[in-house]
Amino acid sequence: MRSAQVYRWQIPMDAGVVLRDRRLKTRDGLYVCLRDGEREGWGEISPLPGFSQETWEEAQTALLTWVNDWLQGNEGLPEMPSVAFGASCALAELTGILPEAADYRAAPLCTGDPDDLVLRLADMPGEKIAKVKVGLYEAVRDGMVVNLLLEAIPDLHLRLDANRAWTPLKAQQFAKYVNPDYRARIAFLEEPCKTRDDSRAFARETGIAIAWDESLREADFTFEAEEGVRAVVIKPTLTGSLDKVREQVAAAHALGLTAVISSSIESSLGLTQLARIAAWLTPGTLPGLDTLHLMQAQQIRPWPGSALPCLKREELERLL
């Protein structure tokens, strides 16, 4: 016997969270809980403002329609990426496809303070990997901060994310301030320039490896082994169903590229599922999931070790 519940939620964010030039005051989303007999599965649907094609309201309409279809015995998935991902996660839990084992390590997001980063990395087992957002300030400043971190911590590898912020000139200004001897310890720089061709040229000219992120969601993108391209960053909430995520990971691995499962600022429930997906599909690769500290609360399932309060399902608004 099938049954389902849908919950709507809103989590206050820390004051300093800015996405694409807009401040994110709250993180809004939905949960779906599917039941079939004794089995249960949860999924999170939380379109990311400025990045997702669909709004929260559109996702809610699509989710409620899909849930009603599922209750009638239909097995298809919605088209909207965030809804397809959340629904497929709930189904994967329900059927036991999604393993319980999780990779709760996360590459810490660094603000540029090497002392703070040394402390955060001290307890990290294995490789010392951190992530730095670049492109928010002057390119020269970014280059100096990255150089300082790599100089201060000799076994550090950095993942950098520019979100296509730079012109070719700005990208070169950044590289100029990173010691060529340290550049090999930049694991990758996500989408440095506004166009893929400019990003490819940057990688060739500087020896700094790049990764594709936004490109994966463009219609003309194809997976290829290219000089200077080392990784792809996969954000499941923006990608679509779990099957589509698996296909992208497999395509990357077949070409020798690193595939990194990355957060779209999901709630703790969604993040714990991403940690399980990372352990399952990209074992041995540190996922990019260090976003919970941007929020003021957890929900339903807590992240191990987090001191944030965790709301129970009874405290959420139920729609179905």
Swiss-Prot record:
Catalytic center residues: 133 (proton donor), 235 (proton acceptor)
Listed InterPro entries: Enolase-like_C_sf, Enolase-like_N, Enolase_C-like, Mandelate_racemase_C, OSB_synthase_MenC1, OSBS_N
GO molecular function: magnesium ion binding; O-succinylbenzoate synthase activity
Cofactor: a divalent metal cation
Entry keywords, A to Z: Lyase, Magnesium, Menaquinone biosynthesis, Metal-binding
Reaction catalysis annotation: (1R,6R)-6-hydroxy-2-succinyl-cyclohexa-2,4-diene-1-carboxylate = 2-succinylbenzoate + H2O
Leading EC class: lyase
Residues where Mg(2+) binds: 161, 190, 213
Listed SUPFAM superfamilies: Enolase C-terminal domain-like, Enolase N-terminal domain-like
GO BP annotations listed: menaquinone biosynthetic process
Pathway: Quinol/quinone metabolism; 1,4-dihydroxy-2-naphthoate biosynthesis; 1,4-dihydroxy-2-naphthoate from chorismate: step 4/7; Quinol/quinone metabolism; menaquinone biosynthesis
Top-level lineage group: Bacteria
EC number in record: 4.2.1.113
PANTHER family per the UniProt record, alphabetical: O-SUCCINYLBENZOATE SYNTHASE (PTHR48073:SF2), O-SUCCINYLBENZOATE SYNTHASE-RELATED (PTHR48073)
Function text: Converts 2-succinyl-6-hydroxy-2,4-cyclohexadiene-1-carboxylate (SHCHC) to 2-succinylbenzoate (OSB).
Family of the protein in this entry: Belongs to the mandelate racemase/muconate lactonizing enzyme family. MenC type 1 subfamily.
Name used for this protein in its record: o-succinylbenzoate synthase
Native species: Salmonella newport (strain SL254)
